[in-house]
Amino acid sequence: MKKTVIELQNIKRNFQVGDETVHALRGISFSIQEGEFVTIMGTSGSGKSTLLNTLGCLDTPTSGEYLLDGVSVRTMSKPQRAVLRNRKIGFVFQNYNLLPKTTAVENVELPLMYNSAVSAAERRRRAIEALTAVGLADRLEHKSNQMSGGQMQRVAIARALINNPAVILADEATGNLDTRTSFEILVLFQKLHQEGRTI
């Protein structure tokens, strides 16, 4: 039986906008098992970003229960959520979120900078391994401005993999890419899924 990586139970998220209460999430319940590939779709304003922010421990629900890899998230403090997020979640964003004046290796190493148990040599080794896994072994020392959009997204995916996260969250990961490059990135996600990653 596969392990449950994400479990949401009756999640609600309300925002106060002036005198009005906006119900962004209304009683969302679902679970994601280890190794699943899940897509969340909906119209603009349907709560996708709010849900992704909740799943990514960037925001907390108004009510309900969220378990990430068996850990209850809703009552955690911001610093506790930051540690959990760094250890359990790999993020891939539409705009890559790479540091412009740093190399591919340095960008990928970033999540490990906050883990004192990992030496500088181990950080570099793991970053090179992750970049090789996404097909960028020949771009290790290239900076963002020396790479194409597809290459930058591959760096972002390598960075998401560096901590061996329980889940990879991708927010419109192909939104800024042309059709051919988008297809290549989706093929890469499919390859990661076939290797047992939860996406």
What do these predicted regions represent?
Residues 3-199:
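ABC family nucleotide-binding domain
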